[in-house]
Amino acid sequence: MSQKLMFLFTLACLSSLPSPFISAQIPAIGNATSPSNICRFAPDPSYCRSVLPNQPGDIYSYGRLSLRRSLSRARRFISMIDAELDRKGKVAAKSTVGALEDCKFLASLTMDYLLSSSQTADSTKTLSLSRAEDVHTFLSAAITNEQTCLEGLKSTASENGLSGDLFNDTKLYGVSLALFSKGWVPRRQRSRPIWQPQARFKKFFGFRNGKLPLKMTERARAVYNTVTRRKLLQSDADAVQVSDIVTVIQNGTGNFTTINAAIAAAPNKTDGSNGYFLIYVTAGLYEEYVEVPKNKRYVMMIGDGINQTVITGNRSVVDGWTTFNSATFILSGPNFIGVNITIRNTAGPTKGQAVALRSGGDLSVFYSCSFEAYQDTLYTHSLRQFYRECDVYGTVDFIFGNAAVVLQNCNLYPRQPRKGQSNEVTAQGRTDPNQNTGTAIHGCTIRPADDLATSNYTVKTYLGRPWKEYSRTVVMQTYIDGFLEPSGWNAWSGDFALSTLYYAEYNNTGPGSDTTNRVTWPGYHVINATDASNFTVTNFLVGEGWIGQTGVPFVGGLIA
């Protein structure tokens, strides 16, 4: 094995655990040391040395400097994108302008993440686990944003010198992430048992009834009871506070007739101390492209049920949209809860990438929802996400992105693709070994959709393929039907990422779960309970607090 390959494999092994477990400390971390010593664990040590001053310092001073330089580069890149849009905005193709607009949007998010991270790092050397996880998540997302921008520009042949800046900016953000993860992220002391069979709020739930324990004013309660035609149960201390409620009813008898109008009415930049802004969307087919922008925080959206409240669109790459902007529903606002809603992209199997939901909303939760499309159905783009008792239908790479995401007790339905295509349930997009990202499929069911089950031609179906170099996906305690290829996983192209990815299975059931004939890649593993517990809600998402406050049921550890 070459020295470079050995180094990459070592990085992959070190990064096979979620962020709190990869904080192997640099010797004498609080003492002055050389850039060469500090940069040993950066993805690109030579680049790291080139951006740090050639004088002794500790990891905190180097980390703060790197974050300040990252912030400066992000500001510069926004100016470059603005100039490019001014130059091309009226003459370039729709897809080119779309890619540039995506980059501008992503760059603004990156500015937010870097500013918050820099302010936190400047204020202290010691962070709580949850605060360290916040910053680790923001820096991971900044790198994801750069990668998404670059992909969009490449796909529309509109790089024009921007790709070099993006490449260097991404490397600088990688230095900031590496130094932060080694300096500020504390070692986690796992105090909870591996086995945690009881779900929070279990007494409120039967399977798939989509009810939340809500607490609201008498006026809001009266509105809720009227629109749902059922009486809201009296709440207790565990109930989720609702600050206000508006209704969306297509016949005009509610507050709004469109979902976007209701979202616009939500307060801006709320801290959630007064509860969630509840949008109740009654049954109907809503043909609109819904967006929850980043300033709309603590929004709760409840529908009348799967296949009752349906949001639908048909944008696709073939029709000139970027993958990033093809989504029927776009979520950027943090602390969002979605319940009892179907989101569809009906572009079809011949239109290429066509997203149903794109989520970049931090600490977002979807419960008892359905996402239906073909290629690239569920774009778990970035930050932290949780899906419980949801259905996902798709074909090629139909759960993809680079969030830290757990899908728990969900139904995943590969469907019939265009002839000649294969199905991949996941295509995880981790590009940096220090990112705290990955996809965990926990306690789910994977079986063919009806059209695939009755297909008149053979379709190969896999658990996933590595979209990016450090792709990370774990399938555990999941039922896998017999239609899965025995090899389990598919390559992206040749031997790309086969040594640096982390794919793992643990204690799955069903005729497709036999690992005897699985791939023999260096990055593939059959893991034990201790390793699997690293990818649970409690350990991977640090989720007991933020998911617990939503009222959505979850299992924090492995299922007994």
Curated annotation (Swiss-Prot):
Mind naming one GO cellular-component term on file for this protein?
A: extracellular region
Task: State the reactions this protein catalyses.
Answer: [(1->4)-alpha-D-galacturonosyl methyl ester](n) + n H2O = [(1->4)-alpha-D-galacturonosyl](n) + n methanol + n H(+)
Site description Transition state stabilizer, residues in chain: Q375
> Where in or outside the cell?
Secreted, Cell wall
List the pathway annotation. Answer: Glycan metabolism; pectin degradation; 2-dehydro-3-deoxy-D-gluconate from pectin: step 1/5
Annotated active site residues, numbered on this chain, are: D376, D397
Q: Name one GO molecular function term.
A: pectinesterase activity
Q: Which GO terms describe its biological process?
A: cell wall modification; pectin catabolic process
The reply to whether Magnesium figures as a keyword in the UniProt entry is no
Tissue pattern of expression reads: Expressed in flower buds.
Ranges of Polar residues compositional bias? 419-439
Question: Keywords of this protein's UniProt record, alphabetized?
Answer: Aspartyl esterase, Cell wall, Cell wall biogenesis/degradation, Disulfide bond, Glycoprotein, Hydrolase, Secreted, Signal
**Family listed:** In the N-terminal section; belongs to the PMEI family. In the C-terminal section; belongs to the pectinesterase family.
The UniProt function text for this chain reads: Acts in the modification of cell walls via demethylesterification of cell wall pectin.
Q: Mind telling me what this protein is named?
A: Probable pectinesterase/pectinesterase inhibitor 20
Q: Which organism is it from?
A: Arabidopsis thaliana
Its taxonomic placement starts with: Eukaryota, Viridiplantae, Streptophyta, Embryophyta, Tracheophyta
